[in-house]
A protein has these predicted regions:
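Short, charged, amphipathic alpha-helices and their helix-cap/turn boundaries
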Residues: 103-104, 140-143
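C-terminal nucleotide
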Residues: 1-12, 18-20, 27-31, 35-98, ...
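Helix-loop-helix module between adjacent transmembrane segments
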Residues: 112-114
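DPxDG-like acidic metal-binding loop motif
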Residues: 116-138
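Gly/Ser/Thr-rich loops at beta-strand to alpha-helix junctions
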Residues: 299
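Short, charged, surface-exposed loops that flank catalytic or proteolytic processing sites
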Residues: 135-140, 251-255
Length: 339
């Protein structure tokens, strides 16, 4: 029996730049890239890495370049953390697991380090494979919580629920993480929206920017927990923008969404320390008439465009900066794996 499961990158369309601040956000998953987990029964339990987890290099320069691109941590730690958290969950819920062992490996072509949630995609795909292998059914909102727990509790990575929710639910989802909701039920209010409501969107990225998200968000987290008024006001502002974008989608007023996305980024720029190269991406897109904001922690942007002529101008402006542009295909498949 061979189990194959996939998970997809996500775009934070509007709302909080992260998601652990009791705010609101709209995100979507898209299938232009993917992470795949492959699991099959074996005599012993073994976790295999991908090409990014290799430990053999051509020379010292190759090693240094690999570390600069991918850091010191590959995907094996993510798989181990997921298996451990899945086991703990089943033990807590008194779910008896069969005694068979397995080998699991993953492969991902999601651009690394550009704010598309590639790490949580690995965990999500792994969790889906484990659920199929052990025939354990877990509610979607709990799956998202488990993915988050694998990162936060097991690996001590600063993270919130947004990425994990959209990668579990897929499609496009409105999320409300208001404190009263989170306190009452330990997860947010999640509402799937019709992808057909979206205006024409683009995603653009480059793979030589940004830094790990767990580093990027630390300063804002500290300020938020201290009650910094500038940060708390920004979180409320982003939550309000999220409701406005949702209203525009439902009413078919998509021509108004671009300016709201721009406002989302402009507010972010006021409280975050943003790298010059990241800013150039946004400015280049806006120079072509498109809207632009980060998809996540930096390195990739998302925005709206009016027509094919504007898209052509957008591609031209971004190409000058060696930035790749795609039209995202919304991931909304119901099948999570194949045996």
């Amino acid at each position: 029996m061979i189990i194959r499961t996939k998970a997809y990158p996500r775009v934070g369309l509007v709302g909080n730049p992260s998601d652990g601040y009791f705010g609101k956000t709209i995100s979507f998953a898209f299938s232009n890239f993917r992470t795949e987990a492959v699991l099959y029964e074996t005599p012993e339990l073994e976790i295999l890495g991908s090409e990014k987890d290799h430990s053999r290099f051509e020379n010292i320069w190759h090693l240094a370049n690999d570390v600069e691109l991918h850091g010191y941590y590959g995907g094996i730690r993510l798989l181990k953390a997921t298996v451990k958290r899945f086991y703990d969950y089943c033990r807590e819920k008194q779910i008896e697991l069969h005694k068979k062992n397995f080998t699991i490996r993953y492969d991902s072509n999601i651009p690394h380090g550009v704010g598309l949630a590639g790490s949580s995609a690995i965990i999500t795909a792994c969790l889906r494979a484990l659920m199929m292998f052990y025939e354990v059914s877990i509610a979607k909102y709990t799956q998202a919580n488990l993915v988050l727990s694998a990162e936060v509790d097991e690996l001590h990575i600063a993270a919130g629920l947004q990425d994990r929710v959209i990668q579990v639910y897929e499609g496009i989802v409105y999320m409300d993480f208001s404190k009263d909701i989170i306190t009452r039920q330990r997860y947010g209010h999640y509402e799937s929206l019709n992808p057909r409501l979206l205006p024409p969107l683009y995603v653009a990225y480059r793979d030589d920017l940004s830094e790990p998200t767990e580093v990027f968000h630390n300063n804002i987290r500290d300020r938020f927990e201290r009650g910094d008024r500038e940060v708390t006001n920004a979180m409320r502002y982003w939550a309000g923008l999220t409701d406005k974008v949702k209203c525009c989608l439902v009413k078919g007023q998509t021509e108004k969404i671009g300016e709201l996305l721009n406002a989302n980024f402009d507010q972010r720029r006021k409280i975050y320390r943003l790298g010059e190269e990241n800013l150039k991406m946004v400015e280049a897109a806006r120079s072509a008439g498109a809207s632009a904001k980060f998809t996540g922690s930096g390195g990739a942007i998302v925005g709206t465009y009016q027509d094919q002529q504007m898209l052509k101008q957008l591609k031209k402006a971004l190409c000058k900066l060696n930035i790749k542009l795609i039209k995202p295909k919304i991931a909304s498949s119901k099948g999570k794996g194949r045996v």
